[in-house]
């Protein structure tokens, strides 16, 4: 989306699920299989482990269906908003970091998309304030994606 156009209602913040599982063999496979059977595609993924548990952060193409699957399969989860970005190349990460620094917005974490149909780099970003981060980045010409941009 061009920074010259008005933001669509869903642009700026997309839904991320943090899925909490035991740190044991096969749990990621179970999660991916459960979602795939419901025709839900994982578009971005990040795993953070500790001794006994793992937090699997995912952004999917159909969050409502994903939430149903997660709950039906008893995957403990928490939904929250994150900012999804599309960048011309990996070199533009510096630009994103600089824009948010100048706006005094802290980046809590970020991780890449697994796949973007346009062939561009994609990032998921969690900041102090998702709406403000999305607005500031869009104002500086960064392509901010909405949930409808992620649907297949």
Annotate the PLM regions.
Residues 1-70, 77-90, 95-97, 101-152:
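Structural preference for solvent-exposed beta-strand-turn elements
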